[in-house]
Structure formats: structure tokens, C-alpha cells
């Protein structure tokens, strides 16, 4: 999957660990949306 920046990772993509994965059809079971204002396409989810 494509990594994405969770709210808990910090304010900027540069220099922070991207702990989320972008899911196009919503977060799968057992995952949660980790970005309040998430990517333009899909959802930024993490386990």
C-alpha cells in the first residue's frame, strides 16, 4: 500500500515516520482512520 501521514506522526511529511496506509474503500476491519482531515483520495488508516 501507499504510506500516509497519520495525525500522530507530526505536522509534516518530511522528517516524520509515515505510519498509515492509504485504503481507497475505507479502513479494513481492525484498522482505524488515523488522520482527521485525510488524503484527497481514500482514507489514511493504521492498525
Curated annotation (Swiss-Prot):
Localization per record: Secreted; Nematocyst
Any one cellular-component term (Gene Ontology): extracellular region
Name the UniProt key words of this record, in alphabetical order: Disulfide bond, Nematocyst, Secreted
| One annotated GO molecular function | toxin activity
Q: Disulfide bonds, which pairs? A: 4-44, 6-34, 27-45
The biological process GO terms on file are: regulation of signal transduction
Pfam families this protein is in? Toxin_4
What SUPFAM superfamilies is this protein classified in? Defensin-like
Q: Which family does it belong to?
A: Belongs to the sea anemone sodium channel inhibitory toxin family. Type I subfamily.
Question: Remarks, anything else?
Answer: Is not active against sodium channels (Nav).
| Protein name according to UniProt | Delta-actitoxin-Axm1g
Q: Which organism is it from?
A: Anthopleura xanthogrammica (Giant green sea anemone)
Amino acid at each position: 500500500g501507499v504510506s500516509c501521514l497519520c495525525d500522530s506522526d507530526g505536522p509534516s511529511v518530511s522528517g516524520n515516520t509515515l505510519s498509515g496506509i492509504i485504503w481507497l474503500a475505507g479502513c479494513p476491519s481492525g484498522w482505524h482512520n488515523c488522520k482527521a482531515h485525510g488524503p484527497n483520495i481514500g482514507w489514511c488508516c493504521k492498525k
